[in-house]
Amino acid sequence: MTDDVTNVEQPSTASEQQPQDVPAAEPSAAKKRRANKAKSKATAAAIEQRLGHSFADPSLLTTAFTHVSALKSARRTDSYQRLEFLGDHVLGLIVSDMLYRAFPDADEGELSKRLADLVRKETCADVARSLDLVEGIKLGTVGAGAGAKLRKSVLGDICEAVIGAIYLDGGYEAASDFVRRNWTERMRKPARSLRDPKTVLQEWAQARGLPTPVYREVERTGPHHDPQFRVAVILPGLEPAEGLGGSKRAAEKVAASAMLAREGVGTGGNDG
């Protein structure tokens, strides 16, 4: 008699089971990058709202906030420095136009003093703080370690770079709107509170161990009854700055104001 053998299917071992499709966990580095990207986008949107300008080219805004210390490469042109250069001159033009229209009775000496005070680094830094632009500054360990976020020079640079970025993105009118919104009240500062630019420049030079500034007449043009003087102010280690005026003294003041503005020194108080 043959024994009946019952074929019973044995359960498969774990090694024989087919793996189920389980979503792979996102790598922590990728999650961090995605979170940082979302945060940067939100920060940029908030800054645009405070600036009153929506960028068609967001890369301009990013560059305007990038300190050279944040760059991994040696390409300094990827930092805000080029935009700062442009913004400095755009700001000077717009503020000069504002002053010319607002003070029709002021001579070139007074206008120059006001201009130097309004475009100095400290004023730009004050605008940057009022708009909370420090939030978007991108710094490397070098800058952050030195507290660069809070340094007046960095904030002033950022403000000028933002003006340059707005100018490139939206043109002169967009840049002018931004400057007028943020400089009109500052422009109304009483002129008597502004110090003589030649005195300020001399004190600034002496504080840095430099000799007394030298003023040299470069040229004299125009008729005898209405001459125009071009004067250069010279300090060792610095590029000369020039000024025009109806008298040598007026031209010297303009030249001193030009050097002060370039070096980020104002005439409204004590600058370090």
Swiss-Prot record:
Residues 1-20 have a biased composition (Polar residues). GO terms for cellular component: cytoplasm. InterPro entries: dsRBD_dom, RNase_III, RNase_III_dom, RNase_III_sf. Residues 1-38 are annotated as: Disordered. Its cofactor is Mg(2+). Mg(2+) binds at residues 84, 157, 160. GO terms for biological process: mRNA processing; regulation of gene expression; rRNA processing; tRNA processing. It is found in: Cytoplasm. PROSITE patterns: DS_RBD, RNASE_3_1, RNASE_3_2. Residues 44-171 form the RNase III domain. Residues 196-265 form the DRBM domain. It holds the Pfam family dsrm. Its EC number is 3.1.26.3. One of its GO terms (molecular function) is rRNA binding. It catalyses: Endonucleolytic cleavage to 5'-phosphomonoester. The active site is at 88, 160. Keywords: Cytoplasm, Endonuclease, Hydrolase, Magnesium, Metal-binding, mRNA processing, Nuclease, RNA-binding, rRNA processing, rRNA-binding, tRNA processing. Homodimer. Belongs to the ribonuclease III family. Digests double-stranded RNA. Involved in the processing of primary rRNA transcript to yield the immediate precursors to the large and small rRNAs (23S and 16S). Processes some mRNAs, and tRNAs when they are encoded in the rRNA operon. Processes pre-crRNA and tracrRNA of type II CRISPR loci if present in the organism. This is Ribonuclease 3. The gene is rnc.
